[in-house]
Protein backbone atom coordinates (compact mmCIF):
# COMPACT_ATOMS: atom_id res chain seq x y z
CA UNK A 1 0.00 0.00 0.00
CA UNK A 2 1.61 3.21 -1.23
CA UNK A 3 -0.95 5.81 -0.22
CA UNK A 4 1.36 7.35 2.36
CA UNK A 5 4.15 7.60 -0.21
CA UNK A 6 1.76 9.20 -2.71
CA UNK A 7 0.58 11.76 -0.15
CA UNK A 8 4.16 12.73 0.77
CA UNK A 9 5.03 13.02 -2.92
CA UNK A 10 1.98 15.21 -3.50
CA UNK A 11 2.74 17.48 -0.56
CA UNK A 12 6.29 17.97 -1.89
CA UNK A 13 5.11 18.71 -5.45
CA UNK A 14 5.27 22.22 -6.93
CA UNK A 15 2.15 24.37 -6.98
CA UNK A 16 -0.13 23.98 -9.97
CA UNK A 17 0.36 26.34 -12.91
CA UNK A 18 -1.49 26.98 -16.16
CA UNK A 19 -0.13 23.77 -17.69
CA UNK A 20 0.66 21.23 -14.96
CA UNK A 21 -1.06 20.10 -11.78
CA UNK A 22 -0.28 17.15 -9.55
CA UNK A 23 -2.68 14.69 -7.92
CA UNK A 24 -2.19 11.68 -5.66
CA UNK A 25 -5.07 9.76 -7.25
CA UNK A 26 -6.92 9.50 -10.56
CA UNK A 27 -9.57 12.18 -10.87
CA UNK A 28 -12.90 11.58 -12.67
CA UNK A 29 -13.28 12.76 -16.24
CA UNK A 30 -15.03 16.11 -16.54
CA UNK A 31 -16.97 14.89 -19.56
CA UNK A 32 -18.35 11.34 -19.68
CA UNK A 33 -19.47 11.68 -23.29
CA UNK A 34 -16.10 10.51 -24.58
CA UNK A 35 -14.55 7.26 -25.74
CA UNK A 36 -11.34 5.59 -24.67
CA UNK A 37 -9.37 3.05 -26.68
CA UNK A 38 -8.80 -0.09 -24.64
CA UNK A 39 -7.06 -3.08 -26.23
CA UNK A 40 -8.18 -1.83 -29.65
CA UNK A 41 -11.83 -1.41 -28.63
CA UNK A 42 -13.45 2.02 -28.28
CA UNK A 43 -15.36 2.26 -25.00
CA UNK A 44 -17.98 4.95 -24.35
CA UNK A 45 -17.75 6.13 -20.73
CA UNK A 46 -21.37 7.34 -20.60
CA UNK A 47 -22.68 3.88 -21.55
CA UNK A 48 -21.53 2.50 -18.20
CA UNK A 49 -24.40 1.55 -15.87
CA UNK A 50 -24.51 0.49 -12.24
CA UNK A 51 -26.82 -1.67 -10.17
CA UNK A 52 -26.21 -0.75 -6.55
CA UNK A 53 -27.15 -1.74 -3.03
CA UNK A 54 -26.22 0.61 -0.23
CA UNK A 55 -25.11 -0.73 3.14
CA UNK A 56 -24.29 1.67 5.99
CA UNK A 57 -21.24 3.50 4.70
CA UNK A 58 -20.51 1.36 1.62
CA UNK A 59 -22.20 0.62 -1.69
CA UNK A 60 -22.03 -2.78 -3.39
CA UNK A 61 -22.23 -2.52 -7.16
CA UNK A 62 -22.60 -4.49 -10.38
CA UNK A 63 -21.08 -2.61 -13.33
CA UNK A 64 -22.00 -3.00 -17.00
CA UNK A 65 -20.67 -1.55 -20.24
CA UNK A 66 -21.46 -2.92 -23.72
CA UNK A 67 -17.73 -3.10 -24.44
CA UNK A 68 -17.34 -5.89 -21.90
CA UNK A 69 -18.79 -8.28 -24.46
CA UNK A 70 -15.97 -7.49 -26.89
CA UNK A 71 -13.59 -9.49 -24.69
CA UNK A 72 -13.69 -13.21 -23.94
CA UNK A 73 -11.09 -12.95 -21.18
CA UNK A 74 -12.71 -12.07 -17.84
CA UNK A 75 -9.44 -10.66 -16.53
CA UNK A 76 -9.46 -8.06 -19.31
CA UNK A 77 -13.06 -7.16 -18.43
CA UNK A 78 -12.04 -6.72 -14.80
CA UNK A 79 -9.15 -4.42 -15.68
CA UNK A 80 -11.35 -2.41 -18.02
CA UNK A 81 -14.08 -2.24 -15.39
CA UNK A 82 -11.78 -0.77 -12.76
CA UNK A 83 -10.44 1.71 -15.30
CA UNK A 84 -14.01 2.80 -16.10
CA UNK A 85 -14.79 3.27 -12.41
CA UNK A 86 -11.71 5.43 -11.91
CA UNK A 87 -12.52 7.42 -15.05
CA UNK A 88 -16.19 8.00 -14.21
CA UNK A 89 -16.25 8.16 -10.39
CA UNK A 90 -12.66 9.00 -9.53
CA UNK A 91 -10.21 6.82 -7.64
CA UNK A 92 -10.94 8.59 -4.35
CA UNK A 93 -14.66 7.77 -4.45
CA UNK A 94 -14.05 4.18 -5.51
CA UNK A 95 -11.66 3.45 -2.66
CA UNK A 96 -13.64 5.21 0.05
CA UNK A 97 -17.23 4.22 -0.65
CA UNK A 98 -17.40 1.15 -2.90
CA UNK A 99 -17.67 -2.27 -1.27
CA UNK A 100 -18.18 -5.42 -3.34
CA UNK A 101 -17.74 -5.01 -7.11
CA UNK A 102 -18.95 -7.28 -9.90
CA UNK A 103 -18.48 -6.66 -13.62
CA UNK A 104 -21.36 -8.11 -15.64
CA UNK A 105 -21.93 -8.77 -19.34
CA UNK A 106 -25.68 -8.08 -19.31
CA UNK A 107 -27.23 -4.78 -18.32
CA UNK A 108 -29.18 -5.33 -15.05
CA UNK A 109 -32.86 -4.38 -15.17
CA UNK A 110 -32.66 -1.78 -12.40
CA UNK A 111 -29.26 -0.36 -13.30
CA UNK A 112 -28.81 3.42 -13.48
CA UNK A 113 -26.46 5.44 -15.68
CA UNK A 114 -23.10 6.07 -14.06
CA UNK A 115 -23.83 9.81 -14.15
CA UNK A 116 -26.81 9.27 -11.81
CA UNK A 117 -24.92 6.93 -9.50
CA UNK A 118 -22.54 9.74 -8.57
CA UNK A 119 -25.37 11.27 -6.52
CA UNK A 120 -25.22 8.27 -4.18
CA UNK A 121 -21.52 8.89 -3.58
CA UNK A 122 -22.12 12.58 -2.98
CA UNK A 123 -24.63 11.62 -0.27
CA UNK A 124 -22.06 9.39 1.43
CA UNK A 125 -19.42 12.10 1.27
CA UNK A 126 -21.83 14.52 2.96
CA UNK A 127 -22.91 11.98 5.57
CA UNK A 128 -19.38 10.93 6.49
CA UNK A 129 -17.09 13.98 6.12
CA UNK A 130 -13.36 13.54 6.59
CA UNK A 131 -13.01 16.74 8.60
CA UNK A 132 -15.15 18.63 11.09
CA UNK A 133 -17.98 16.86 12.91
CA UNK A 134 -17.59 13.24 11.87
CA UNK A 135 -20.30 10.61 12.25
CA UNK A 136 -19.75 7.30 14.02
CA UNK A 137 -21.64 4.20 12.94
CA UNK A 138 -22.80 1.68 15.55
CA UNK A 139 -23.54 -2.01 14.99
CA UNK A 140 -23.91 -5.16 17.06
CA UNK A 141 -22.49 -8.60 16.35
CA UNK A 142 -22.65 -11.92 18.21
CA UNK A 143 -19.53 -13.92 19.08
CA UNK A 144 -19.98 -17.19 20.99
CA UNK A 145 -23.53 -16.09 21.83
CA UNK A 146 -22.26 -12.88 23.42
CA UNK A 147 -22.92 -9.38 22.03
CA UNK A 148 -20.12 -7.23 20.65
CA UNK A 149 -20.87 -3.53 20.25
CA UNK A 150 -18.97 -2.02 17.33
CA UNK A 151 -18.38 1.66 16.65
CA UNK A 152 -16.60 2.78 13.50
CA UNK A 153 -15.65 6.11 11.94
CA UNK A 154 -16.19 5.74 8.17
CA UNK A 155 -14.55 5.56 5.78
CA UNK A 156 -12.19 2.90 7.16
CA UNK A 157 -9.67 3.22 4.35
CA UNK A 158 -6.13 4.50 4.00
CA UNK A 159 -7.20 7.53 1.98
CA UNK A 160 -9.01 8.88 5.05
CA UNK A 161 -5.57 9.57 6.60
CA UNK A 162 -2.76 8.16 4.44
CA UNK A 163 0.06 9.43 6.66
CA UNK A 164 -1.21 7.39 9.61
CA UNK A 165 0.38 4.08 8.68
CA UNK A 166 0.82 2.43 12.09
CA UNK A 167 -2.09 0.55 13.64
CA UNK A 168 -2.20 0.63 17.43
CA UNK A 169 -4.51 -1.85 19.13
CA UNK A 170 -5.36 -0.90 22.72
CA UNK A 171 -7.26 -3.52 24.73
CA UNK A 172 -8.75 -2.90 28.18
CA UNK A 173 -10.18 -5.55 30.47
CA UNK A 174 -13.15 -4.27 32.51
CA UNK A 175 -15.72 -5.43 35.07
CA UNK A 176 -18.24 -7.30 32.94
CA UNK A 177 -21.87 -8.29 33.19
CA UNK A 178 -22.71 -11.93 32.43
CA UNK A 179 -23.36 -10.80 28.85
CA UNK A 180 -19.73 -9.67 28.58
CA UNK A 181 -20.68 -6.00 28.35
CA UNK A 182 -19.64 -3.41 30.98
CA UNK A 183 -21.19 -4.24 34.34
CA UNK A 184 -22.56 -0.84 35.35
CA UNK A 185 -22.62 2.90 34.72
CA UNK A 186 -19.46 3.43 36.76
CA UNK A 187 -17.55 1.07 34.48
CA UNK A 188 -18.93 2.82 31.41
CA UNK A 189 -17.84 6.19 32.76
CA UNK A 190 -14.34 4.88 33.49
CA UNK A 191 -14.06 3.55 29.94
CA UNK A 192 -15.27 6.86 28.55
CA UNK A 193 -12.73 8.77 30.61
CA UNK A 194 -9.79 6.69 29.44
CA UNK A 195 -10.98 7.01 25.82
CA UNK A 196 -11.07 10.80 26.16
CA UNK A 197 -7.60 10.80 27.72
CA UNK A 198 -6.23 8.69 24.86
CA UNK A 199 -7.81 10.95 22.25
CA UNK A 200 -6.19 13.96 23.92
CA UNK A 201 -2.82 12.20 24.03
CA UNK A 202 -3.00 11.25 20.36
CA UNK A 203 -4.09 14.76 19.32
CA UNK A 204 -3.16 15.48 15.69
CA UNK A 205 -0.71 12.58 15.43
CA UNK A 206 -3.40 9.96 14.80
CA UNK A 207 -7.03 9.04 15.35
CA UNK A 208 -9.23 6.35 16.79
CA UNK A 209 -11.19 4.79 13.92
CA UNK A 210 -13.01 1.86 15.54
CA UNK A 211 -13.96 0.47 18.95
CA UNK A 212 -15.14 -3.06 19.80
CA UNK A 213 -16.72 -3.74 23.19
CA UNK A 214 -17.66 -7.18 24.49
CA UNK A 215 -16.54 -10.36 26.24
CA UNK A 216 -15.07 -8.29 29.07
CA UNK A 217 -12.80 -6.24 26.83
CA UNK A 218 -12.81 -2.95 24.98
CA UNK A 219 -10.55 -2.93 21.91
CA UNK A 220 -9.71 0.45 20.42
CA UNK A 221 -8.17 0.75 16.95
CA UNK A 222 -5.93 3.75 16.36
CA UNK A 223 -3.93 4.75 13.30
CA UNK A 224 -1.01 7.03 14.08
CA UNK A 225 2.09 8.71 12.72
CA UNK A 226 4.82 6.59 14.26
CA UNK A 227 7.47 9.22 13.55
CA UNK A 228 5.99 11.23 16.42
CA UNK A 229 6.06 10.38 20.14
CA UNK A 230 2.38 9.47 20.13
CA UNK A 231 2.82 5.85 21.26
CA UNK A 232 4.84 6.96 24.29
CA UNK A 233 2.09 9.44 25.21
CA UNK A 234 -0.53 6.70 24.87
CA UNK A 235 1.45 4.39 27.15
CA UNK A 236 1.60 7.12 29.80
CA UNK A 237 -2.20 7.38 29.74
CA UNK A 238 -2.66 3.61 29.90
CA UNK A 239 -0.55 3.42 33.05
CA UNK A 240 -3.49 5.10 34.81
CA UNK A 241 -5.94 2.25 34.04
CA UNK A 242 -6.49 0.25 37.24
CA UNK A 243 -9.61 -1.76 36.43
CA UNK A 244 -7.98 -4.70 34.66
CA UNK A 245 -5.26 -5.71 32.27
CA UNK A 246 -4.37 -3.35 29.45
CA UNK A 247 -2.36 -4.09 26.33
CA UNK A 248 -0.99 -1.86 23.56
CA UNK A 249 0.25 -3.43 20.32
CA UNK A 250 1.56 -1.30 17.43
CA UNK A 251 2.01 -2.73 13.93
CA UNK A 252 2.90 -1.25 10.55
CA UNK A 253 -0.32 -1.35 8.52
CA UNK A 254 -0.34 1.20 5.67
CA UNK A 255 -3.28 -0.55 4.02
CA UNK A 256 -5.48 -0.43 7.16
CA UNK A 257 -5.99 -4.18 6.91
CA UNK A 258 -6.44 -4.51 10.67
CA UNK A 259 -9.86 -2.83 10.45
CA UNK A 260 -10.98 -4.13 7.06
CA UNK A 261 -13.37 -6.58 8.77
CA UNK A 262 -15.18 -3.61 10.34
CA UNK A 263 -16.20 -1.97 7.06
CA UNK A 264 -19.96 -2.19 6.69
Kindly label every feature range from the protein language model:
Residues 238-247:
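A common structural junction motif
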Residues 254:
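Glycan-association/targeting regions that enable binding to alpha-glucans and other polysaccharides
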Amino acid sequence: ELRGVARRWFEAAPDADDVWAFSEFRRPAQDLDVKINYEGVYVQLSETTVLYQRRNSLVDIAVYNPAFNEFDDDSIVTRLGFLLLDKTLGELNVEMWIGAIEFVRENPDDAVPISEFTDVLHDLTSEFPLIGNRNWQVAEAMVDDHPIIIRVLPPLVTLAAPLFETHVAVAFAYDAHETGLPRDEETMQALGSIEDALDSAVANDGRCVAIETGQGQRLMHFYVDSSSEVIQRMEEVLALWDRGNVNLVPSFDPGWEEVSHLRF
